Amino acid sequence: MPPFLLLEAVCVFLFSRVPPSLPLQEVHVSKETIGKISAASKMMWCSAAVDIMFLLDGSNSVGKGSFERSKHFAITVCDGLDISPERVRVGAFQFSSTPHLEFPLDSFSTQQEVKARIKRMVFKGGRTETELALKYLLHRGLPGGRNASVPQILIIVTDGKSQGDVALPSKQLKERGVTVFAVGVRFPRWEELHALASEPRGQHVLLAEQVEDATNGLFSTLSSSAICSSATPDCRVEAHPCEHRTLEMVREFAGNAPCWRGSRRTLAVLAAHCPFYSWKRVFLTHPATCYRTTCPGPCDSQPCQNGGTCVPEGLDGYQCLCPLAFGGEANCALKLSLECRVDLLFLLDSSAGTTLDGFLRAKVFVKRFVRAVLSEDSRARVGVATYSRELLVAVPVGEYQDVPDLVWSLDGIPFRGGPTLTGSALRQAAERGFGSATRTGQDRPRRVVVLLTESHSEDEVAGPARHARARELLLLGVGSEAVRAELEEITGSPKHVMVYSDPQDLFNQIPELQGKLCSRQRPGCRTQALDLVFMLDTSASVGPENFAQMQSFVRSCALQFEVNPDVTQVGLVVYGSQVQTAFGLDTKPTRAAMLRAISQAPYLGGVGSAGTALLHIYDKVMTVQRGARPGVPKAVVVLTGGRGAEDAAVPAQKLRNNGISVLVVGVGPVLSEGLRRLAGPRDSLIHVAAYADLRYHQDVLIEWLCGEAKQPVNLCKPSPCMNEGSCVLQNGSYRCKCRDGWEGPHCENRFLRRP
């Protein structure tokens, strides 16, 4: 084999081994801007009189796979074109050894027809005769095109490895008023693409492999040249620095080696040192400027607070992915409340064992807790101390009552490093962590030390911890699994320890910490998420006095749960002469508001139907639209004397089939058969002899509810999808498959197709 053919074969082999996903173009912008470029490409729409001809390279150097990507790019561009005989006309050529007209500009009058025809294009193979294709268009024009008053656009999709000279025919085309876009595919030769493209080159040279970026660039140029206005007025075209890369084989000097050289003059062969070279694959970089359109996004104003992540949803909507403690509000601005007076000292491990990353996470945890809990009328005072070799009180307890000032002061606390002397820090915190002016007697607030650490202590902790607890300090520990045993020894109880598995899980401990600060070891499952609806029989058979007993019982039960949008949500439905929602799941986000609403629930009288009330809960209470949370256990507690329950068995089973537990509290000396059928399983029925005895069965009810709250859930039961959308389980989550005309995460938005 001749040497040059051998080299060519080696080059082809090496090029074929390079994965096509290598970054052949890089726009130097942030990930957020890249997302905006991608989003804008889907919103751009060209509706003007213009003739657009695609010229697709179908040669062997492109290959069948890259030809399919070229077709995908052309189809994506067509998605943004108002194709009709009067507006945008589209045609297509394929070229290799010879040019082949796939369809002229006047063949199809709808977008669907054009896209379907492009999909049917078949790869031909052959040489890359770009020059012949351009000359064909020079001699015959754009087939099916209109007169010169209509802008003519030629979009050439090629790898730029033509076997002829393309500069002259492309120049002549441009002189005739044809706007030429050169779109690279596979490993493009950018020099040839620049020779093909119209001026300015940065606006007319694109890369088909990055289809959304290329589509955006093409429509941005059309907008800038006033061919068609493809974006909304508030969108803007901006120039960004970018790089184009070309994969080439280059010869590299490798050294000298002994060789023999002949001389014609002496007819002798002489020993000498000859240079030798190696071939190497390299990316050659071409600096460029890329022009792209971006539109204002709903997340530009940073609406999500407290570390929440803003996720755009369409043009104007957004969703905040909030840490657990802040998930109850649209902007992660949930305010938890403390129902006791407390002096709180956060004790942060600033030793080398925790590391700088761990220390910074602890500071963020304190910031988020402070934002969630403190307010102008808060009865909590907060301080912060750090420790390694010794204790440093960085923010004395109560120094700041203004939340922004307190958060700002936390930013200035430095990481110190050094040994982890937790025992010494606990002793010093007990002695001087709360200052010397602490009130005594009943007027003194509860004093709490919250220790945050990820490393084992290098000194003894049991004695200092006992010393701190003897001074009436409540010790709470927050740490990784590795230090659980040590934290339990320090706090004196496993119930005073909060362990996290990863950095995000640390922030999920905020509501649990808030609950422990004022809790007195009440029964219940205060940190378990639950959607709970009480259904009260307020028919004439119950009577106003017994209804008041039921209200008192519901208030007492609800107090055993942490009522806020991140943990337990409570709703109340009453039924008698009619069915009425006293309050929905997401309408009373605090315990105080919920208790007031329970007391204000109306007594209806009349004849009640438990079945109708259960269907009301199924249709109008336990739904995503009314505040029910996907992935959270759900339960309904029915309190009734038994009358009107004859029609309730089927509706109750409907609730159970959709993942909603139903417990019946039947009151009266004898339970009716209808009430037994309503209850279903025997463990879903609590029999109470009289309304006055309800309070004696509270613990049994709470235990049952806590058990239900810990059961695994099916994210699609009840379905979170609206407007008859179908819920599909997928990779531990779910997605909603929407009917035609609806879109959105829960099929909540009506989708109007463009004409």
UniProtKB/Swiss-Prot annotation:
InterPro entries cross-referenced by the UniProt entry: ECM_Assembly_Org, EGF-like_Ca-bd_dom, EGF-like_dom, VWF_A, vWFA_dom_sf
Keyword annotations: Disulfide bond, EGF-like domain, Glycoprotein, Repeat, Secreted, Signal
VWFA domain residues: 51-222, 343-517, 531-705
Site (Cleavage): L267, A268
Cystine pairings recorded for this chain: C299-C310, C304-C320, C322-C332, C716-C727, C721-C736, C738-C747
Glycosylation sites: N147
Signal peptide: 1-23
A molecular function GO annotation: identical protein binding
Note: May be used as a serological marker for colon neoplasia.
PANTHER family per the UniProt record, alphabetical: COLLAGEN ALPHA, VON WILLEBRAND FACTOR A DOMAIN-CONTAINING PROTEIN 2
The protein, known as: von Willebrand factor A domain-containing protein 2
Organism encoding this protein: Homo sapiens
